[in-house]
C-alpha cells in the first residue's frame, strides 16, 4: 500500500461544459498514470463549476483511513498569476479550517515547461496542415492578468516556443486584462510581412476566453482576405500534460520547488502595482456553500493558516509567498 499523500488537482473553473469535461478527463488520465503509486487522485474548481475544491477534499479525506493527514495540491494554471498565488491558496486555507489535521504541500504552476512548448508546437503543426514553418508567424495568446509577472511570462513562453523551431516570427498578446490585444498582435505580424499566421491559444481547456480568441482571429482574417489565418487547438487533456502534473506532484513531495519571487507583485512593490502589496486574500465561494455565511470567520482563519504556512515549510516547501498580503486579483467573471 502506498504511503504517499493523495493528489488534488485544482482548476479555476468555467461555465463551459466542454471545459469541465476536459478537466475531468485530465484527472482521470493522471489517476491512470500513477499506476497505484498515489493512493487517491481527485480534482476540483475554486469557482464557477463543480466539483468544487471542497467536494474534492471531502473525497480525499474520506479515502484516508487515518484521518485527514497531508495532501499535495497541484494548481492547474499555466502562469503564477492571481489564481495560483492567491485564490487557490486561499481556497486551500479554508479547507484547513474545515478539516482539522489536514495539511498540504503546494505545487508550482505548470508553465513554463518544455512539455508545454512541445504540445503547443504539435498543435501549431496540426493547424499548419503541412505548410512550412519558415513561412509562418505564430501569435501566442495568453489569458492576460493584472499581475505583470504573469504577463511577462507569456513573452518568455513565446520566445521559448520560437527558439529552434524555424517559425518565420512569433508575437505574444492577451485576450483580456492586458495589452497587446489579439487584433494588435495580428496587425503587427502583418506589418512584419506575415502572409500566414497561426494563432496559438495558451489555454489548458475550452471556455469563454478561448472561444473569444477564435472569434477575434476570424474577424481579423475576414478583413484581410490575402492573409491566411488558422487557430491552433488548445493544450487540452493529454498524456504529456498528465505526466507534467505528476512531475509537479513529485517536486512538491520532494521539496524541489524552485520559484522566483523577485518580480512577484504580491511581494515586491513594482512601479504601477504598489496597491497589490498589503491587501488580504479571500477565497471564492460556490453558490449554496454554507461557509459563505461565515466568510469573516474563514477570512480570519486564512490569516491564521498563513502563519502555519510560513512556519511549517515542511508542508509547503519552496512556496514562500506571504498569502496574507495578496490582493484578490481582478479577473473577468465568465459565463
What are these regions (language model features)?
Residues 1-335:
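Active-site-proximal alpha-helix that buttresses catalytic centers in soluble enzyme cores
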Amino acid at each position: 500500500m502506498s504511503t504517499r499523500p493523495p493528489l488534488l488537482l485544482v482548476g479555476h473553473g468555467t461555465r463551459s461544459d466542454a471545459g469541465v469535461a476536459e478537466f475531468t478527463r485530465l484527472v482521470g488520465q493522471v489517476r491512470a498514470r500513477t499506476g497505484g503509486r498515489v493512493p487517491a487522485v481527485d480534482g476540483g474548481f475554486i469557482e464557477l463549476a463543480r466539483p468544487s475544491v471542497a467536494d474534492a477534499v471531502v473525497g480525499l479525506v474520506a479515502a484516508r483511513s487515518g484521518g485527514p493527514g497531508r495532501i499535495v495540491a497541484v494548481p492547474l494554471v499555466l502562469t503564477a498569476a492571481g489564481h495560483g498565488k492567491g485564490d487557490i491558496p486561499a481556497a486551500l486555507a479554508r479547507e484547513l479550517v474545515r478539516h482539522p489535521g489536514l495539511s498540504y504541500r503546494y505545487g508550482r504552476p505548470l508553465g513554463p515547461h518544455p512539455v508545454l512548448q512541445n504540445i503547443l508546437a504539435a498543435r501549431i503543426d496540426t493547424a499548419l496542415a503541412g505548410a512550412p514553418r519558415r513561412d509562418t508567424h505564430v501569435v501566442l495568446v495568453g489569458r492576460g492578468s493584472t499581475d505583470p509577472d504573469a504577463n511577462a511570462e507569456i513573452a518568455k513562453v513565446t520566445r521559448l516556443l520560437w527558439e529552434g523551431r524555424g517559425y518565420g516570427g512569433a508575437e505574444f498578446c492577451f485576450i483580456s486584462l492586458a495589452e497587446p490585444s489579439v487584433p494588435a498582435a495580428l496587425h503587427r505580424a502583418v506589418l512584419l510581412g506575415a502572409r500566414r499566421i497561426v494563432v496559438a491559444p495558451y489555454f489548458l481547456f475550452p471556455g469563454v476566453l478561448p472561444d473569444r480568441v477564435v472569434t477575434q482571429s476570424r474577424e481579423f482574417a475576414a478583413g484581410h482576405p490575402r492573409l491566411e489565418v488558422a487557430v491552433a487547438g488548445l493544450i487540452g487533456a493529454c498524456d504529456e500534460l498528465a505526466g507534467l502534473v505528476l512531475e509537479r506532484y513529485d517536486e512538491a513531495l520532494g521539496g524541489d520547488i524552485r520559484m522566483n519571487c523577485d518580480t512577484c507583485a504580491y511581494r515586491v512593490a513594482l512601479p504601477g502595482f504598489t496597491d497589490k502589496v498589503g491587501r488580504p486574500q479571500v477565497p471564492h465561494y460556490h453558490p449554496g456553500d454554507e461557509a459563505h455565511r461565515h466568510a469573516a470567520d474563514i477570512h480570519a482563519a486564512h490569516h491564521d493558516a498563513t502563519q502555519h504556512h510560513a512556519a511549517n515549510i515542511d508542508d509547503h516547501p519552496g512556496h514562500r509567498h506571504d498569502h496574507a498580503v495578496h490582493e484578490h486579483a481582478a479577473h473577468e467573471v465568465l459565463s
